[in-house]
Structures are given as structure tokens and as C-alpha cells.
């Protein structure tokens, strides 16, 4: 579960979030929608502990996986190793990483390094790594941006399957993406989400 109570966040004199309160129940799938620059990414960065708000409280109950808007991969690791790095040691780890790569259509990229991959391929690997890491809460910041329609459908199906029954918080501009992955949508309005 995620509870946000009267959160305020500013960048200098510009207030981005104003008395924002939100409750995301365990196991629910929630989308945050709004115009660019309204504070969607800032809010999930606060939830992830990457930003400190000016005031208010955030409570996160559970282990969090986060897929950033821009893929963050280790440049010295291959695609499969970027996934494998979050798995505990054991004989099942490599097959799990390979299974996830296959599920997003990247088996042939197994041994490639991030600099050899397109932006969409990197994003799919970042999603695979978050799924491999597991946890109770998945934060997704524009995860399907830049993917073609077939790949978007493939990745959406994987997210629904792998994250069934767990909490998902999605930031998106795309209503069809929100509809595909979430059962509730909050829209930005005057510094908060309603």
C-alpha cells in the first residue's frame, strides 16, 4: 500500500505538488495522468525515496521495483546480466532472465551491451529487470514510450501476467496505456491528483 498525505514539493519557487494526498491500496493498479511538467514523475520519485518533499508524509508498505522514464542499465553488463544482477544466486536465475527476455522479444539481444541496443530495447530490458527483482509495488514512469504497437501489447500482457495481484503505479500520457494496465486513473488538477 502507498499512502501520501498532504505532500508539497517545490523546485525553487515553483511549487509542483500542493497538498497532494493519495492512497493506493495493496494489489490495485493505478495510473497518474496529466500534462508534461505537472509533477507525475516527481511524485513517484518521492514515493521511491529519490526526492524529499517540502512537507507531508509518504508511507510505502512493501518492496518497490521502479522502471524509470529513461532506461537505466549498467553499461558494462550484457542484456541478460542486467536482468540477472537483481536475481539471487542460484541455478534458476539465468533461465528466469532468459525467459523474461524471450517474453519481450529480445532473446537475440541476450549478449548485447546497452550501447548496442535501441532505446525501446533498453526499456524492455529495464522492465524485465524490475519484474525479475519482484516486490510488492511496481512504479512505472512512461514504460511503453517509444515502443511500436505490437511490442506495447506484448509488454503490457507481460506486465499484467507477472504483476497480477500486486500494486502497480503507472505514470503515462496515454489513456489506452492506462486502460490496458490499470483499474483506476487519477488526473492532475491544480497541483494534486484527483
Features from the language model and the residues they span:
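Helix N-cap at the start of a conserved alpha-helix in ABC-type nucleotide-binding domains
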Residues: 149-151
Amino acid at each position: 500500500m502507498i499512502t501520501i498525505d498532504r505532500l508539497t514539493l517545490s523546485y525553487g519557487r515553483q511549487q509542483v505538488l500542493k497538498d497532494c494526498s493519495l492512497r493506493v491500496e495493496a494489489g490495485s493498479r493505478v495510473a497518474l495522468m496529466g500534462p508534461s511538467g505537472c509533477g507525475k514523475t516527481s511524485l513517484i520519485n518521492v514515493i521511491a525515496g529519490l526526492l524529499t518533499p517540502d512537507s507531508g508524509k509518504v508511507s510505502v508498505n512493501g518492496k518497490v521495483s521502479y522502471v524509470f522514464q529513461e532506461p537505466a542499465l549498467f553499461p558494462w553488463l550484457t542484456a541478460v546480466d542486467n536482468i540477472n544482477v537483481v536475481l539471487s544466486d542460484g541455478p534458476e536465475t539465468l533461465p528466469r532472465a532468459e525467459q523474461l527476455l524471450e517474453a519481450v522479444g529480445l532473446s537475440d539481444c541476450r549478449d548485447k551491451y546497452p550501447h548496442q541496443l535501441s532505446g525501446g530495447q533498453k526499456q524492455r530490458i529495464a522492465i524485465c529487470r524490475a519484474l525479475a527483482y519482484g516486490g510488492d509495488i511496481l512504479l512505472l514512469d512512461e514504460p511503453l514510450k517509444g515502443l511500436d504497437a505490437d511490442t506495447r501489447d506484448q509488454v503490457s500482457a507481460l506486465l499484467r501476467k507477472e504483476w497480477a495481484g500486486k500494486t502497480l503505479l503507472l505514470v503515462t500520457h496515454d489513456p489506452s496505456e492506462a486502460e490496458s494496465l490499470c483499474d483506476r486513473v487519477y488526473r492532475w488538477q491544480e497541483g494534486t491528483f484527483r
